[in-house]
């Protein structure tokens, strides 16, 4: 399996400049989408709680969030392709199949693989964007070089510092790191509310209130320094001219390029 995953990860075209467009044909579909977004908001709050708890290591909070995202991608793979999703993704990757199911499975499987790698690989930024339109939503799984954006909150883990410090400065660094984690926890907790505001329930809002919404987020790590960011994104109302009746891959929208220009540091590269 490890050999297959290395081969799969070598195909940078799987994610690059692409997104998954999923139809929202009725209120039941909207409710499911809303539920998924509320799960993301809840995960933000759980991460904030863990960061604010001095008895929980920063790495544990970081890995818990990564594992949660990876599990969601695995569920998507199974929903699209069944239990043989890995075989289907690999078949698409090597050119043995060229169909919609194969393309979607390969997309989410690549995202799954990269999320699993981020537990041990640093200096790689997770930079997704989720957009709601009147009849559909899009998910663009992005990764970029580096570990932060121009608007990220930074916080440190003294357990991951390789510096040799004397006792006095080590205690000061430890306390400053805990303070940075508490500051980050407050920021991350606020981002959960942004998600809830951008994607309201179909049972508690009018169609006009919920037909457009969007967020982009970013998370990264470099050594002992971790970063988080989440902000609203204004969807382009002219992005799609034709409806869609099943999930499919589409080119990324103008919103993706705009957020890259606004948020990625100079020299950063979308992977």
Curated annotation (Swiss-Prot):
GO process annotations (BP): cell swimming
Pfam families linked: HVO_2248
Task: Give the top-rank taxon of the lineage listed in the UniProt record for this protein.
Answer: Archaea
Indicate, by first and last residue, each region the UniProt record lists as having compositional bias (Basic and acidic residues).
251-261
Q: Which parts of this chain are annotated as the region Disordered? A: 233-261
Give the observed phenotype of the deletion mutant.
Cells having transposon insertions in this gene are hypermotile.
Q: What's its job? A: May be involved in swimming motility.
Q: What is this protein called?
A: Uncharacterized motility-related protein HVO_2248
Species of the source: Haloferax volcanii (strain ATCC 29605 / DSM 3757 / JCM 8879 / NBRC 14742 / NCIMB 2012 / VKM B-1768 / DS2) (Halobacterium volcanii)
């Amino acid at each position: 399996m490890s050999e297959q995953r290395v081969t799969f990860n070598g195909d940078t075209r799987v994610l690059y400049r692409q997104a998954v467009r999923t139809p929202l044909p009725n209120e039941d579909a909207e409710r499911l989408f809303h539920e998924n977004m509320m799960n993301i908001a809840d995960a933000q709050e759980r991460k904030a709680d863990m960061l604010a708890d001095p008895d929980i290591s920063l790495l544990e909070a970081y890995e818990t969030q990564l594992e949660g995202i990876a599990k969601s991608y695995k569920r998507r793979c199974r929903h699209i392709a069944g239990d043989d999703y890995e075989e289907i993704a690999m078949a698409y990757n090597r050119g043995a199949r060229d169909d919609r199911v194969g393309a979607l499975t390969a997309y989410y499987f690549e995202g799954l693989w990269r999320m699993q790698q981020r537990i041990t690989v640093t200096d790689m930024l997770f930079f997704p964007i989720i957009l709601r339109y009147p009849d559909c939503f899009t998910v663009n799984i992005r990764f970029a070089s580096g570990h932060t954006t121009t608007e990220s909150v930074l916080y440190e883990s003294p357990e991951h510092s390789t510096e040799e410090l004397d006792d006095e400065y080590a205690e000061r660094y430890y306390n400053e790191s805990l303070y940075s984690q508490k500051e980050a926890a407050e920021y991350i907790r606020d981002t959960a509310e942004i998600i809830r505001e951008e994607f309201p329930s179909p049972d508690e809002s009018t169609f006009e209130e919920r037909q457009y919404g969007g967020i982009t987020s970013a998370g990264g790590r470099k050594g002992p320094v971790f970063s988080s960011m989440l902000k609203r994104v204004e969807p382009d109302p002219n992005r799609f001219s034709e409806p869609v009746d099943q999930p499919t891959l589409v080119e990324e929208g103008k919103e993706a390029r705009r957020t890259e220009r606004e948020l990625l540091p100079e020299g950063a590269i979308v992977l």
